[in-house]
């Protein structure tokens, strides 16, 4: 146990976590030169393409230091704000963390938020200054920033470069010297924390865990404490680049377990594994469920694929503990699910993974957040509104509360004005402004979460020329003037396009929505009115003109009554068509409504 070190890597997006992890694997000869490729641990195609880490990955390395063999368990974590739960999960399984800061970009908002997560869990922090070989690197200034943030000494900061491999030996030495070995007693009853699970179509669910106390043996009967289900440990082992089966995994180590579990619901991340015969009395605490921030409907394009979609979602949920979904139905789209996501990036990723890994083509509706509505009848009782169609009628409504967040934005001093006006346009309230250095400013805003859901992140990057970084944490519900905006096509409400928005923006959004839909819905044989309404009041209207046949073409001689007869006949036909005709909405129309401000 004294020779084990568990650590994770935390950093802002693109500060070089995955590349540095590759170098560590190379230096410890965990991977041969032949297996080496960039972003070795990002094994989803999607992660490679976007160059981001989505899942945390665990891998074991062996390293000789001063003549002794050490076992290092590395857990690579994502840097994006949407995936901070992945980070918190990995942090729970470690004793130390490498805090990586890009020498060119300095400290960003997420560096700080992930650092606080690590400090709350009492991890030993090793600061690493990455990318020092870049011509634009500014190591002296950035070192000062790190010292201000951590209160460490200048000589504690390790200079490194993931690209060239410079400084990797120093990092490994620091991990062994500074990070404490895991605490725990191999003699006590088994107690292990599940921090990840993966679905394997042939072998069922692979559970990835870290043993806190005791040891787990092959063939032992074990129990999951949250569900009280018992299983046999058919195969256990440690994780190198591939799985290495072992007969016993003891306290302090990270390993995997296969016991032929097929049901996704039986494995809960954050659960405790214990021995079925001699169970431990207490569960491992300090692991809370993630709360989804953004809700959207996901529907199969073909209603018959509903069951396939359900099983695909369950398999995704295994690998992604933060995805929540409940069945719902919509008049326009049939049966589907209302899903909760951590943010817009998460929603896009889930949609892409459904398409890639499970061949499901899905329609997503307008994303929204979760509101609380109070009626005049019972002003004390809160109704949870995840779907705009659940909102009570305006006449019965007393008030609506929406979730607010505290946003921290770090930007260059030149862009403060732009960032402020963007936040104020999004109904933000500035609470604090501090200059970290003469160049960098930290702004704090209280903002409604709903305003961030759409395109806030992209627009923030645009107004700050890519320099601003952004992080947020929820601060509770506040009362707001919200209205439900309905879209009517051919006088019928399309429930999938409804949205809850602030009263002041209603007219603008309604107008934009109708204009956008007019461009995207194909013309029919009859006029289609597109209306935006609040309750019974229509606030904007556009009409898609009918395609018409020239019925008078065959009349030569120009007798007006003959022409009129044919035109009247056509008019009657169009009227009848309009009564029975229904309008198909293409998927592009749903997606375009989300991106109204472009």
From Swiss-Prot:
Class in the EC hierarchy, top level: hydrolase
Membership in a protein family: Belongs to the TRAFAC class translation factor GTPase superfamily. Classic translation factor GTPase family. LepA subfamily.
One GO term (biological process): positive regulation of translation
E.C. designation(s): 3.6.5.n1
UniProt entry keywords in alphabetical sequence: Cell inner membrane, Cell membrane, GTP-binding, Hydrolase, Membrane, Nucleotide-binding, Protein biosynthesis
Membrane topology type: Peripheral membrane protein
Stated name of the protein: Elongation factor 4
Binding site for GTP: 14-19, 130-133
Pfam families referenced in this protein's UniProt entry, alphabetically: EFG_C, GTP_EFTU, GTP_EFTU_D2, LepA_C
Reactions catalysed according to its record: GTP + H2O = GDP + phosphate + H(+)
Organism, scientific name: Flavobacterium johnsoniae (strain ATCC 17061 / DSM 2064 / JCM 8514 / BCRC 14874 / CCUG 350202 / NBRC 14942 / NCIMB 11054 / UW101) (Cytophaga johnsonae)
Domain tr-type G, chain residue ranges per copy: 2-183
Domain of life: Bacteria
MF (Gene Ontology): GTP binding; GTPase activity; ribosome binding; translation elongation factor activity
Transmembrane region(s): none
Compartment(s) where it occurs, according to its Swiss-Prot or TrEMBL record: Cell inner membrane
Function: Required for accurate and efficient protein synthesis under certain stress conditions. May act as a fidelity factor of the translation reaction, by catalyzing a one-codon backward translocation of tRNAs on improperly translocated ribosomes. Back-translocation proceeds from a post-translocation (POST) complex to a pre-translocation (PRE) complex, thus giving elongation factor G a second chance to translocate the tRNAs correctly. Binds to ribosomes in a GTP-dependent manner.
Any one of the GO CC terms: plasma membrane
Main location: membrane
């Amino acid at each position: 146990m004294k020779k084990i070190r568990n650590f994770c890597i935390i950093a802002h997006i693109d500060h070089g976590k995955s590349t540095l992890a590759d170098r560590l694997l190379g230096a410890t000869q965990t991977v041969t030169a032949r297996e080496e490729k960039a972003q070795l641990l990002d094994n989803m195609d999607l992660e490679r393409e976007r160059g981001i880490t989505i899942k945390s990955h665990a891998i074991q390395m062996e390293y000789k230091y001063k003549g002794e063999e050490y076992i290092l368990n590395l857990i690579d974590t994502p840097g994006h704000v949407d995936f901070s739960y992945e980070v918190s999960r990995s942090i729970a399984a470690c004793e130390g963390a490498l805090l990586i800061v890009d020498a060119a970009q300095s400290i960003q908002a997420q560096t700080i938020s992930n650092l606080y997560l690590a400090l709350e869990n009492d991890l030993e922090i090793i600061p690493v200054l990455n990318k020092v070989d870049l011509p634009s690197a500014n190591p002296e200034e950035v070192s000062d920033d790190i010292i201000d943030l951590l209160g460490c000494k200048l000589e504690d900061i390790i200079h490194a470069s993931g690209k060239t491999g410079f400084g990797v030996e120093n990092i490994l030495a620091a991990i062994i010297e500074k990070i404490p070995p895991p605490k725990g007693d191999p003699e006590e009853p088994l107690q292990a924390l599940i921090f990840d699970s993966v679905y394997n179509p042939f072998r069922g669910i692979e559970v990835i865990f870290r043993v806190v106390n005791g040891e787990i043996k092959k063939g032992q009967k074990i129990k999951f404490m949250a569900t009280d289900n018992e299983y046999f440990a058919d195969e256990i082992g440690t994780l190198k680049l591939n799985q290495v089966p072992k007969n016993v995994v003891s306290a302090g180590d990270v390993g995997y377990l296969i016991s032929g579990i097929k049901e996704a619901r039986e494995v809960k991340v954050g659960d405790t594994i214990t021995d079925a015969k001699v169970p431990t009395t207490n569960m491992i605490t300090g692991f809370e469920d993630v709360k989804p921030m953004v809700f959207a409907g996901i529907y199969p394009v073909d209603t018959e694929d509903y069951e396939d979609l359900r099983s695909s979602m369950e398999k995704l949920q295994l690998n992604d503990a933060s995805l929540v979904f409940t069945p719902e139905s919509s008049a326009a789209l049939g049966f589907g699910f209302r899903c909760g996501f951590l943010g817009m990036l998460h929603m896009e990723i889930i949609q892409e993974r459904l398409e890639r890994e499970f061949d499901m083509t899905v329609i997503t509706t307008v994303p929204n957040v979760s509101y609380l509505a109070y009626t005049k009848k019972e002003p004390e009782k809160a109704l949870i509104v995840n779907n705009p169609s659940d909102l009570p009628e305006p006449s019965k409504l007393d008030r609506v509360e929406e979730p607010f967040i505290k946003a921290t934005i770090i930007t260059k001093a030149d862009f403060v004005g732009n960032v402020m006006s963007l936040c104020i346009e999004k109904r933000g309230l500035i609470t604090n402004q501090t200059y970290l250095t003469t160049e960098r400013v930290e702004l704090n805003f209280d903002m409604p979460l709903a305003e961030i859901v759409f395109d806030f992140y992209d627009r923030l990057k645009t107004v700050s020329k890519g320099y601003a970084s952004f992080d947020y944490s929820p601060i509770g519900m506040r009362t707001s003037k919200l209205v439900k905006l309905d879209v009517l096509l051919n006088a019928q409400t399309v429930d999938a396009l409804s949205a809850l928005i602030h009263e002041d923006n209603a007219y603008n959004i309604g107008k934009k929505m109708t204009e956008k839909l007019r461009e995207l819905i194909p013309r029919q044989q009859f006029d289609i009115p597109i209306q935006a309404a609040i309750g019974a009041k229509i606030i904007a209207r556009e009409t898609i003109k009918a395609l018409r046949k020239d019925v008078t073409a065959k009349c030569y001689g120009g007798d007006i009554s003959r022409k009129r007869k044919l035109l009247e006949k056509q008019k009657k036909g169009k009227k009848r068509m309009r009564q029975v005709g229904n309008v198909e909405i293409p998927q592009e129309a749903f997606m375009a409504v989300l991106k109204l401000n472009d």
